[in-house]
């Protein structure tokens, strides 16, 4: 079987764009899990998940591969794609690319024995994906916040890759941006690029001042105390991977608008997101 035969199974609009890009380069591509958007596929063969995997040597699964630990992350599928022993067996002997491979290994011991290559572990991928996520977060703010970004008080919690793209971007649009970070070195970075910086305890004491609160920390940092301290017309956005870091029940009790903003590259920039995955996959294959 030729290495030029790929399977793209599950995922959102970025996986559709990825399949189309591969096919446009003359690569044979089998797809599954895109029934709700089948008309968007160009030059690829649509089939069931097992057939797609069995026909290919290289399989590309989404990021994350699962949200419930039992089925493939396939929001565009008309049916649940079970991550059962049969699907696992079909993947044996294949080169399997996946975003956040640990999520798949946790499903069952069989998945831990597969040849899984994690494109999410590639630093170039992470940086470019963070940039796309930051732009998507800006789109969500513009969509859901009733005021302009310019002049708004914004708090961004955490100081990872997404924050380092998003916080300066918002500041360039005229927002007054504060970064809440645990490490003194992260707070020093924020100050060095012209932002305000606070520890988490100090940011809590100023919570009522912020109109927009954006969490990037996958831990319960925007908790009940935090939500109770916010202005009632604040917007809370959680960019952190599940389970996130926002107390949703308290947001609902206080009727504070809160958004769980996951998969933003796939929602707002699927073609760029697909290019990032494709280039990362091809680089890993070339490097052997």
Predicted feature residues:
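Phosphate-coordination loops involved in phosphoryl transfer and adenosine-cofactor binding
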Residues: 2-5, 93, 150-153, 233
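Glycine-rich adenosine-cofactor-binding loop
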Residues: 6-17, 22, 150-171
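Residues in the short beta-alpha loop(s) of Rossmann-like NAD(P)-binding domains
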Residues: 12, 33-35, 102, 182-184, ...
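NAD(P)-binding Rossmann-fold cofactor-contacting core
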Residues: 25-41, 173-193
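Short acidic-hydrophobic, aromatic-tinged amphipathic segments that line or gate anion-handling sites
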Residues: 43-51, 196-203
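Glycine/serine-rich phosphate-binding loop and adjoining beta1-alpha1 elements at the start
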Residues: 61-151, 280
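Rossmann-like adenosine-cofactor binding region
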Residues: 64, 68, 80-93, 193-266
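Rossmann-fold NAD(P)-binding glycine/threonine-rich loop
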Residues: 95-119, 239-285
């Amino acid at each position: 079987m030729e290495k030029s035969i790929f399977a793209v199974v599950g995922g959102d609009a970025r996986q559709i764009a990825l399949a189309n890009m591969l096919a446009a380069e003359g690569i044979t591509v089998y797809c599954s899990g895109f029934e709700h958007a089948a008309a968007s596929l160009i030059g690829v063969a649509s089939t069931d998940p097992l057939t797609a995997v069995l026909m290919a040597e290289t399989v590309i699964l989404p990021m994350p591969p699962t949200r419930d630990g039992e089925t493939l992350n396939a929001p565009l599928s008309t049916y649940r794609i079970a991550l059962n022993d049969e699907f696992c067996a079909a993947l044996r002997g294949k080169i399997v690319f996946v975003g956040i491979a640990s999520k798949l290994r946790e499903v069952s011991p069989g998945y831990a024995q597969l040849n899984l290559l994690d494109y999410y572990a590639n630093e170039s991928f992470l940086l470019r994906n963070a940039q796309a996520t930051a732009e998507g977060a800006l789109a969500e703010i513009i969509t859901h916040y009733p005021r302009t970004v310019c002049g708004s008080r914004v708090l961004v919690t955490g100081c990872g890759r997404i924050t380092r793209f998003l916080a300066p971007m918002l500041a360039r649009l005229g927002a007054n941006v504060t970064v809440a970070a645990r490490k003194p070195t992260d707070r020093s970075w924020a100050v060095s690029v012209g932002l305000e910086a606070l520890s988490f305890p100090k940011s809590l004491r100023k919570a009522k001042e912020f109109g927009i609160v954006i969490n990037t920390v996958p831990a319960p940092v925007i908790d009940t105390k935090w939500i109770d301290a916010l202005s009632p017309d604040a917007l809370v956005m959680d960019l952190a991977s599940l389970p996130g870091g926002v107390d949703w029940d308290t947001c609902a009790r206080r009727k504070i608008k809160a958004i769980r903003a996951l998969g933003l590259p796939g929602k707002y920039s699927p073609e760029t997101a697909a290019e990032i995955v494709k280039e990362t996959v091809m680089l890993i294959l070339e490097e052997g």
